[in-house]
Every structure is written in structure tokens, then in C-alpha cells.
């Protein structure tokens, strides 16, 4: 990423996204932070989402870190619910559809759990990897972001 770029960070308020956004800003990039904590207009499960469309369309690069997740206790309690699966499926369909439409380079944040087919979270992350590969994006897999 040489020179100043317009970068969108999907999931910019999360454990990784907050630090990544800060780092990219310090490096002189124009960072558009996109996260549901910024308001309902940044809820990526809403289709269509004009704010998300504009964020992706106006970017040179996108970091796709957003996911409906919240640590091991959250996963244990919610990953087998309709809402969890529905939210993440919609979120991915929305973002990947726009990344394809505007042909934007991107990185998708996956997980070491993506090979765990018994876990809805793992299965959804694997689906994200397949979307990413089909669109020519890059996949990064995190093991444990909490230390």
C-alpha cells in the first residue's frame, strides 16, 4: 500500500479493526471506519445499504473484518441460533456482492475455526473464504486475537 489510499475497514470498532484503523491513519491513509456501533445506517445486514455501497465504491482497498461475533462465550450461546446464521449470511452476501460489483481489492478476516464443520461460526467463515477466493481477494486467518 504505497502512497495515500482510501481504505474502508468493515468492522472498524472490533478488536482488530480499531487498531488497524488507527495504524492506517497514522500511515497517512484516508480511513473510512464502518461498524454497526457507529449507528444503524452501518448495519451490514440491511440490504440494500447505501452507506455500505458508497463506502466500498469510494475505496481503493477494503479490509473485511466485520462479523456478528463476540468471543467464546458469545459463540457458545448464540452460534446455533437462526439470528446468528442469518446475520452473518446477510452481512457476507451484502459485502461480497458490492466488492464484486465494484471490483475492489480486499482482505477477508477468517478464523482458525473455518475447518470446523460442526461449528456454524466455522462453516460461515469457510463460506467467506470461498467467496473471497472466487473474487480474487486475500484471506487471513486469526488464531486468537484476545491474547
Please annotate each region the language model reported.
Residues 5-27:
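N-terminal Rossmann NAD(P)H-binding glycine-rich loop of SDR-like oxidoreductase domains
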Residues 64, 90-123, 138:
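Conserved Rossmann-fold NAD(P)-dependent oxidoreductase catalytic core, especially the SDR/UDP-sugar
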Residues 69-70, 111-119, 143-146:
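Active-site segment of SDR-like NAD(P)-dependent oxidoreductases
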Residues 49-87:
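NAD(P)H-binding glycine-rich loop region in Rossmannoid oxidoreductase-like domains
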Amino acid at each position: 500500500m504505497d502512497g495515500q489510499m482510501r481504505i474502508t475497514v468493515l468492522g472498524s470498532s472490533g478488536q482488530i479493526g480499531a487498531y488497524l484503523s488507527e495504524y492506517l491513519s497514522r500511515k497517512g491513509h484516508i480511513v473510512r471506519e464502518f461498524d454497526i456501533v457507529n449507528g444503524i445506517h452501518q448495519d451490514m445486514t440491511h440490504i440494500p445499504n447505501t452507506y455500505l455501497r458508497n463506502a466500498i465504491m469510494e475505496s481503493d482497498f477494503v479490509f473485511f473484518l466485520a462479523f456478528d461475533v463476540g468471543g467464546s462465550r458469545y459463540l457458545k450461546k448464540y452460534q446455533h441460533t437462526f439470528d446468528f446464521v442469518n446475520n452473518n449470511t446477510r452481512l457476507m452476501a451484502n459485502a461480497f456482492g458490492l466488492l464484486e460489483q465494484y471490483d475492489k481489492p480486499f482482505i477477508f478476516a477468517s478464523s482458525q475455526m473455518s475447518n470446523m464443520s460442526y461449528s456454524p461460526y466455522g462453516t460461515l467463515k469457510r463460506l467467506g473464504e470461498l467467496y473471497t477466493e472466487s473474487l480474487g481477494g486475500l484471506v487471513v486467518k486469526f488464531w486468537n486475537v484476545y491474547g
